[in-house]
């Protein structure tokens, strides 16, 4: 399993994925990325229509448009947005790591000096 998959699974389990997704959507809207991608899609559709690639017999499918737009759209994401998201994910993972360590330490506190549990 890749680190990306592990992080994805963790954020889904903790409910943080929706927070991260909302943050990403907000930042992409604020920086104008969504408008740029919308314009990119329009331009591609216009180019295909002018070139005769899109006719009444042969339509560009959504999948084809997504395949063409995705690499370009990813390069348009500002570095500041990428860094902010990465920092947010690291914070979430660090908090989880700290909580896991704190819970483990609490278990050890239940034992007295002789190694027997206090009840």
Curated annotation (Swiss-Prot):
Residues 96-119 have a biased composition (Acidic residues). Keywords: Activator, Chromatin regulator, Cytoplasm, mRNA transport, Nucleus, Protein transport, Transcription, Transcription regulation, Translocation, Transport. It is found in: Nucleus, Nucleoplasm; Cytoplasm. GO terms for cellular component: cytoplasm; DUBm complex; nuclear periphery; nuclear pore; nucleoplasm; SAGA complex; transcription export complex 2. It comes from the Eukaryota. GO terms for molecular function: C2H2 zinc finger domain binding; chromatin insulator sequence binding; TFIID-class transcription factor complex binding; transcription coactivator activity. GO terms for biological process: heterochromatin boundary formation; mRNA export from nucleus; poly(A)+ mRNA export from nucleus; positive regulation of transcription by RNA polymerase II; protein transport; transcription elongation by RNA polymerase II. Residues 93-119 are annotated as: Disordered. Gene3D superfamilies: 1.10.246.140. The keyword NAD does not apply. Involved in mRNA export coupled transcription activation by association with both the AMEX and the SAGA complexes. The SAGA complex is a multiprotein complex that activates transcription by remodeling chromatin and mediating histone acetylation and deubiquitination. Within the SAGA complex, participates in a subcomplex that specifically deubiquitinates histone H2B. The SAGA complex is recruited to specific gene promoters by activators, where it is required for transcription. Required for nuclear receptor-mediated transactivation. PANTHER family: ENHANCER OF YELLOW 2 TRANSCRIPTION FACTOR. Belongs to the ENY2 family. Component of the nuclear pore complex (NPC)-associated AMEX complex (anchoring and mRNA export complex), composed of at least e(y)2 and xmas-2. Component of the SAGA transcription coactivator-HAT complexes, at least composed of Ada2b, e(y)2, Pcaf/Gcn5, Taf10 and Nipped-A/Trrap. Within the SAGA complex, e(y)2, Sgf11, and not/nonstop form an additional subcomplex of SAGA called the DUB module (deubiquitination module). Component of the THO complex, composed of at least e(y)2, HPR1, THO2, THOC5, THOC6 and THOC7. Interacts with e(y)1. Interacts with su(Hw) (via zinc fingers). This is Enhancer of yellow 2 transcription factor. It comes from Drosophila willistoni (Fruit fly).
């Amino acid at each position: 399993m890749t680190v990306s998959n592990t992080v994805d699974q963790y954020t889904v389990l903790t409910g943080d994925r929706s927070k991260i997704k909302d943050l990403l959507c907000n930042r992409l809207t604020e920086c104008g990325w969504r408008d740029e991608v919308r314009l990119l899609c329009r331009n591609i559709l216009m180019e295909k229509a002018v070139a005769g690639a899109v006719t009444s017999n042969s339509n560009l499918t959504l999948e084809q448009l997504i395949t063409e737009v995705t690499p370009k759209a990813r390069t348009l994401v500002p570095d500041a947005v990428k860094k902010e998201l990465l920092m947010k994910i690291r914070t979430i993972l660090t908090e989880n790591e700290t909580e896991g360590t704190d819970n483990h330490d609490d278990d050890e506190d239940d034992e007295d000096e002789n190694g027997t549990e206090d009840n």
